[in-house]
A protein has these predicted regions:
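Active-site neighborhood of glycoside hydrolase catalytic domains
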Residues: 65-70, 76, 101-238
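Aromatic-lined carbohydrate-binding/catalytic grooves of carbohydrate-active enzymes
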Residues: 3-138, 151
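Short intrinsically disordered, low-complexity coil segments enriched in acidic
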Residues: 1-4, 173
């Protein structure tokens, strides 16, 4: 997509927030088609028990109460409606109220004996650890393998605190932030290179990640969470 014209997209987030089901998403897809929109993105809330921002990050399996037929079936139906299908992830995060955190509380960035500071009810996964990266590659990559997904919104909605890793000895703790980025690049290299037909868009509370490393993997970046049409023109064009 580096040299391609990007599709016009619509995102369900501000239309539905967490309150959606399959029929509501399909209704948005049909309306998008009528308006000449080429891609519909299903944002936060499709996985785990995610009915608010208080839980389930890291549990990347479909919420069958909202989408009983699963992501692959929804993607197929959206494509049949005449628009492509995109999906939101926040892979680097984990909710304390999640199956992943309960199984692996040491997988988040933390310092033993210190309080784990939550932002937006979430913690940051420790991507300096190989097993954490392996989990993301297998889980996120598996979803993309199984469904007709044309776009991924890769979100990141908090800053890092308590910079420590349970996978490093005390004398190497200062390596953690650098090793985190190496781990993230490995995850992106595996997932992006395995899915060359998917458009990946970086997002971090808006445009918080305009760095060369992310731009290498993400040919599109969400510029700002300010969606006022006039203000957005000033933001995007300086």
């Amino acid at each position: 997509y580096r040299d391609e014209v990007r599709p016009i997209l619509a995102n369900n987030w501000e239309a539905t927030y967490f309150d959606f089901d399959e029929e509501k998403i399909l209704g948005l897809a049909r309306t998008a088609k009528e308006l000449g929109i080429e891609l519909l993105v299903l944002d936060d809330g499709w996985f785990g028990k995610r009915n608010s921002d208080t839980c389930s990050l890291g549990d990347w399996y479909v919420n069958k109460e909202k989408l009983p037929d699963g992501i692959a079936a929804l993607a197929q139906k959206v494509n049949e409606a005449g628009v492509k299908f995109g999906l939101w992830f926040e892979p680097e995060m984990v909710s304390p109220d999640s199956d992943l955190y309960r199984a692996h509380p040491d997988w988040c960035i933390h310092i033993p004996g210190r309080e784990r500071t939550e932002c937006r009810n979430q913690l940051t996964l420790d991507l300096s650890r190989k097993e954490v990266c392996d989990y993301l590659i297998k889980t996120i990559g598996g979803i993309l393998d199984q469904a007709e997904i044309s776009y991924v919104k890769w979100d990141m909605n908090r800053h890092m605190t308590e910079l420590g890793s349970a996978g490093l000895p005390p004398e190497r703790q200062k390596e953690m932030p650098h090793r985190y980025m190496l781990g993230l690049y490995r995850v992106l290299e595996e997932i992006v290179s395995s899915h060359p037909d998917v458009l990946f868009e970086s997002c971090s509370g808006g445009g918080g990640r305009f760095d060369a490393g992310m731009l290498y993997y993400m040919p599109q970046t969400w510029t700002s969470d300010d969606t006022d049409a006039v203000e957005r023109l000033y933001i995007q064009y300086g």
